[in-house]
Amino acid sequence: MAVSKFVQIRRDLHKIPEIGFKEWKTQQYILDYIGTLSNEHVEVKVWRTGVIVKVKGKNPEKVIGYRADIDGLPITEETGYEFASVHEGMMHACGHDLHTTIGLGLLTAAVTERIDDDLVFLFQPAEEGPGGALPMLESEELKEWKPNIILGLHIAPEYPVGTIATKEGLLFANTSELYVDLKGKGGHAAYPHTANDMIVAASHLVTQLQSVISRNVNPLDSAVITIGKITGGTVQNIIAEKSRLEGTIRTLSVESMSRVKSRIEAIVAGIEASFQCEAVIDYGAMYHQVYNHEALTREFMQFVSEQTDMKVITCTEAMTGEDFGYMLQEIPGFMFWLGVNSEYGLHHAKLRPDEEAIEKAIVFLDQYVKWKGTRK
């Protein structure tokens, strides 16, 4: 059965997931598609592995921005799709193929029927890490076209197609990666008294970290520390000289993030003293909370509820991390969840979003942008 133009675009993109700042094929695909739309009203800039596109308005008073993240994840796909990833060990497991497709659909509509205001589309690399939103925001390429209003979306497997979910104010958490490297003294398993076991040190550290949230953060102010990976040792009869812990920190307030990091540093210092080892902490990529502009979000929710076919749900904040939060620090705007009704969740190897959501999103966002960017 033939599929629609934009479903096919999504499938094309799904085949070529690429990690942050290496999205060369994705960038070229976007540029090639934009080339089919180009006219005197369309301007294109390349920023690293991303693309910035401006559609000139007929009588602009402001700039409306749409941001789509374009990178994939280092996950081996298990969807069974005929159009599964052709890049081994890589997958679009967070819906960025849909985000990008919806952006191209909205761009197509904008070129076909121009509005009064300027539109800027940000096809942003590296959302999954190391973070592309902040450097794109600070780039010379964007300064001239910086939006006055910006919006973004994220697919939501748990919501049905035809539904969006968002809220005023805090939507997504502050997030930080966490890496701790421990170094002691290795040795033979038969002579533990001559060595300094970093497997044991790492085990104690993981256990002690469990008290950081439960005893240092207000229970009404949610926070999470997860250690997702521990490595150490080389063979079963050698005491490990080194170990490494990798995890994530998520909080719903900046104050809690600061407090949690302070406690982690104190506990790691205690591990150093207790086990006579060296420890190095690296917080890796850190993302600012996604905080929706109250008035714009309220207006958007009302418009979608009253003037489109989409159902609007007021959701609660989530511990999800998104570097779009940096853009919302500087530009009034909002992010929302788009229902795609998948049995499997984000970052799962079997994530299968319902493609019907693509056309629905393009249609209702085009309605909103035309309403917001046209003089009444």
Curated annotation (Swiss-Prot):
Q: Which residues form the active site?
A: D69, E128
Catalytic activity reads: N-acetyl-(2S,6S)-2,6-diaminopimelate + H2O = (2S,6S)-2,6-diaminopimelate + acetate
Query: Which keywords has UniProt assigned to this entry?
Result: Amino-acid biosynthesis, Diaminopimelate biosynthesis, Hydrolase, Lysine biosynthesis
Q: Which GO terms describe its biological process?
A: diaminopimelate biosynthetic process; lysine biosynthetic process via diaminopimelate
Enzyme Commission numbers on file? 3.5.1.47
Q: Which GO terms describe its molecular function?
A: N-acetyldiaminopimelate deacetylase activity
Q: Which Gene3D superfamilies match?
A: 3.30.70.360, Zn peptidases (3.40.630.10)
Tell me the leader sequence span.
none
Give one Pfam family.
Answer: Peptidase_M20
Q: According to its UniProt record, in which pathway does this protein act?
A: Amino-acid biosynthesis; L-lysine biosynthesis via DAP pathway; LL-2,6-diaminopimelate from (S)-tetrahydrodipicolinate (acetylase route): step 3/3
Which InterPro entries does the record cross-reference, listed alphabetically?
AcetylDAP_deacetylase, Amidohydrolase, Bact_exopeptidase_dim_dom, Peptidase_M20, Peptidase_M20_dimer
Domain of life, per lineage: Bacteria
Family membership noted in the UniProt record = Belongs to the peptidase M20A family. N-acetyldiaminopimelate deacetylase subfamily.
Q: Which PANTHER family match?
A: N-ACETYLDIAMINOPIMELATE DEACETYLASE, PEPTIDASE M20 FAMILY MEMBER
Provide the function of this protein: Catalyzes the conversion of N-acetyl-diaminopimelate to diaminopimelate and acetate.
Indicate what this protein is called per its UniProt record: N-acetyldiaminopimelate deacetylase
Organism whose genome encodes this protein? Bacillus anthracis
What does UniProt list as this organism's lineage? Bacteria, Bacillati, Bacillota, Bacilli, Bacillales
